[in-house]
Amino acid sequence: NSPLAESSIVGTAVGMAVTGYKPVVEIQFGDYIWTAMMQIRNEVATMRYRSNNAWTCPMVIRVPVGGYIHGALCHSQSIDGYFIHLPGIYIAYPSCAADAKGLLKMACRMDDPVIFMEHKGLYRQGYAATEEPDSDYLLPFGKGRLVIEGDELTIVTWGAMVQKSMEAVQLLNLPDGLIEIIDLRTLNPIDLDLIESSIEKTSKVLVVHEDNITNGP
């Protein structure tokens, strides 16, 4: 057991990671991850760089994030806009159960730190309860998913905004084949090949996210 102190949770995980363990820890709400920023920014993210690849800091930090649960200011924050700019850390942000399992299993097998964001608005939602391909399913990082195909506009999104984007398209009652939706699945690395191939077709892109407008993802 660990104390409900984010700096201690991540700091303990750092010590375990550099001594051969693979810790999987949870920050109860992304809103409180900031007290662990010294450990994440200066220790976890820089371990490989500072040691010239002699040391790594493999761990998985699970972080529930996002709004839509009436959690007010301390239980609704989105943190992807910050962490996507932080080098040295992989970021997963699934939109459904199958992707969550495949990405989490892959994260546990990687030799680098992973921040695994879980949108609270997806918990216990029927539309997020997807079937897994098989019990050994692994989903590689950096491989997005083409949700629906279209040739007029590309929507690039992730997490809970995938469903919100699909609902918006349905609400507008647009003909099929106009809107293309891409679910990134991971924010670091990003599937640039999938994005580029879609934009070559549509020539227009809309990024849908839940973080700050200024300096967001």
Label each PLM-derived region with a short phrase.
Residues 1-117, 120-217:
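Thiamine diphosphate
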